[in-house]
Amino acid sequence: MADIYTMGVDIGSTASKTVVLKNGKEIVSQAVISVGAGTSGPKRAIDSVLKDAKLSIEDLDYIVSTGYGRNSFDFANKQISELSCHAKGVYFDNNKARTVIDIGGQDIKVLKLADSGRLLNFIMNDKCAAGTGRFLDVMSRVIEVPVDELGKKALESKNPCTISSTCTVFAESEVISQLARGVKTEDLIAGICKSVASRVASLAKRSGIEELVVMSGGVAKNIGVVKAMEAELGRDIYISKNSQLNGALGASLYAYESFQKERS
């Protein structure tokens, strides 16, 4: 019997992610490109996974797109919401997951999962950039520390400062003022991470926390935010190895299920 190859394409606001699965369970290739919808990112991510998997797009049996820019991808057989795809991808990685906190480039989502992995309900904030990946990108530029180094730097802090502004624009001004006063960079970064964690934890508490708590999305790679989140919630947080790829993984899993249904 021939192998079945499916691809999930997660086109976010700030990054493009792809996962190719073989027979609905084996990850053959994956890619993350740090530009999202409306850019060359999706095409580059797709080209990358196909090259790694030694496949052409014609070799794929089914493709599902998800994310902010899911409707912009013409080759998809189906589009599925990122909420469902994140839930599916996280549960595939760890079937003990019951609460999923996903911090994206422009929004924050908290998902509640059933024991079966089905998405029960969700709460999200997409009205303000504060607490999102975009917020961290802005702060990274202001303090001149690469965004992927923020987490490690935050752990060096002995005296985290307080960022009181909840608006990105005002928080940026506040950080600039604190820099001018000579506040240590690591203390500022720790304060920034704590500010993100506080905002996200507030949303998560409104949803209700049930263990296991899993953090998904690119911000999950920021150890400073993760540690601050654990302190805010008073419990450990599980981070999957490929946290930024959970949406694309879920989309590829849905692609496999859809192909099987349509074939039967």
From Swiss-Prot:
InterPro entries, alphabetized: ATPase_BadF (IPR002731), ATPase_NBD (IPR043129), CoA_E_activase_dom (IPR008275), Dehydratase_Activator_Redct (IPR051805)
Protein residues bound to [4Fe-4S] cluster: 128, 167
Cofactor(s) named in the record: [4Fe-4S] cluster
The entry's keywords: Hydrolase, Iron, Iron-sulfur, Metal-binding
Pfam families, per the entry: BcrAD_BadFG (PF01869)
GO biological process, one term: L-phenylalanine metabolic process
Pathway: Amino-acid degradation; L-phenylalanine degradation
Gene3D superfamilies cross-referenced by the UniProt entry: 3.30.420.40
Source taxon at top rank: Bacteria
Molecular function terms from GO: enzyme activator activity; hydrolase activity; iron-sulfur cluster binding; metal ion binding
Cofactor note text: Binds 1 [4Fe-4S] cluster per dimer.
Subunit record text: Homodimer.
Protein name as annotated: (R)-phenyllactate dehydratase activator
Originating organism: Clostridium sporogenes
